[in-house]
Amino acid sequence: MSNPQPDDSNNRIVAVTLDEESIGRSGPDIEHERAIAIYDLVEKNLFAPEGAGEGPFTLHIGITGSRLMFDIRREDGTPVVAHLLSLSPFRRIVKDYFMICDSYYQAIRTATPDKIEAIDMGRRGIHDEGSRTLQERLAGKVRIDFETARRLFTLISVLHWKG
């Protein structure tokens, strides 16, 4: 006999905002990636802050000093919890991610399909590493699935680039 799984249909993010003070000027490729990540995140995600009960939730992401801030609220704006995470574990990953993204965006304009595919595989690998790191940093604080972690990592990368 298996244990029933919790109903996660309400454990999700319904709105995401990024701290405008934390966002640096980005090129159109990065802005496009950010918009897609927000759209995809809101469309499909698993986000369950520990001890918060059921959602849905809103999430405001920003950089405060050298920390990543997740300000989690209920849909009506009632505060749930704010988590501050050190940016140190993300610095190298984000730097590598942006370097390979630059290579990828240059390659899609001029390189062969094989070269583009090789760069894209590397880009996805670094993105996966950042996503796993985020899941580890949120363990015991917020339960998220891997796809949610991937979309959140994209947004963190945009913020961290300025920080």
From Swiss-Prot:
Disulphide connectivity of cysteines: none
InterPro entries according to UniProt: UCP032146
Domain of life: Bacteria
Family, per entry: Belongs to the UPF0262 family.
Annotated protein name in UniProt: UPF0262 protein RPB_4349
Source species of the chain: Rhodopseudomonas palustris (strain HaA2)
